[in-house]
Amino acid sequence: MNWWIVLSPLFCGLVVFFIRKDFMQYTLLIGTLLLMRQWGSRWWNVLAVCILGVFGLFLHEAYLFWGIPLSVAVLYGYTRRPAVAVASSLLFIGCFALMCVYKGDSSNVEAILDSWHRLLGDEYHKSGLSIVALGWNAVHTFWVHFNLNFHVSLFEVNVGWMGAVIQLLFFMAAYYFILNFSWTFRRQTSDFTAADRTNLSAIYLLCALTLLPMFTILSCDYSRLYQYLFVTSYAAVLILPRGVCTAMLPGRYLTYVGRMNASIDRYLPSSKGLMVLLLLLLAVAPYSLNLYLAFEYSVVGTISEIFMRALRWLVHLV
């Protein structure tokens, strides 16, 4: 397995915020996969996985759309019992429903912000903190995110709802990248087999489907969303046995994904040069659709920024 993909902003996200709950949830998910690999379908292990899933939800409810689907799929892959998958799904959905009902209101927002103000003083701005979303109603939340996601301006040019097309094109580029990077740079066939490639892309597409509400009406934080996709997909393929990855996904679905990947190989074959180019340039803005900001967060943009800062420092010394 080639680890250079970790350098991609799509994989590492905003690592400067490593203390955020997202990275705690990644740890929970990886722990869940390790538990299942070690102890399998034992009843107490299934219970432990469910407890970890509930804890992940209480860390951040977005876990329902990426960590929970994979956890349920893994439970089914090991137990081969639909009842276990259904029961665990109902448990997680029930917890999520309770969180939606008791999410808090504007008074809770003010209490939280006031407590922060006593600690941080004037070093934060209330209008720029996502915590204020606790006071929003559902319709307002959906519309704000939908508008940010698809009705956008690029380089000061208003492209309107063409943002939806741009989003789709970027998603296709990200899929092509994750599909081919490890495959193109594998040293031996056994390092990353054709089955691994199919499983990786199938899990990626499945997580993308379950994350669709986040990509449309519940979020606009693309650095987090694509990191969810990349970390989840690679964690599953690297930790779980190949047979479990295959068993937890529908056979027809895997066949369809395999055929789609074969078509991509036929019409747009990969190369090491193309993969390096995507590694250096393919990035996404932390939030909303902004090509300039996306370039700043790319590997090339980051190196350029470091170079310019060093140059300004040298000029200042002179």
Where are these regions (language model features)?
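Aromatic- and kink-enriched transmembrane "portal" helix at the membrane-lumen/periplasm boundary
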Residues: 2-27, 58
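Specific aromatic-rich, kink-prone transmembrane helix
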Residues: 25-53, 69-71
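Membrane-interfacial, low-structure loops and terminal tails that flank and connect transmembrane helices
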Residues: 32, 184-199, 245-273
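Membrane-interface alpha helices of multi-pass inner-membrane proteins
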Residues: 46-61, 66-72, 94, 263
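Hydrophobic/aromatic-rich transmembrane helices and adjacent perimembrane loops
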Residues: 65, 220-242
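Perimembrane helix-loop-helix junctions
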Residues: 67-92
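Membrane-lumen/periplasm interface segments of specific transmembrane helices
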Residues: 84-178
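Transmembrane alpha-helix segments characteristic
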Residues: 192-215
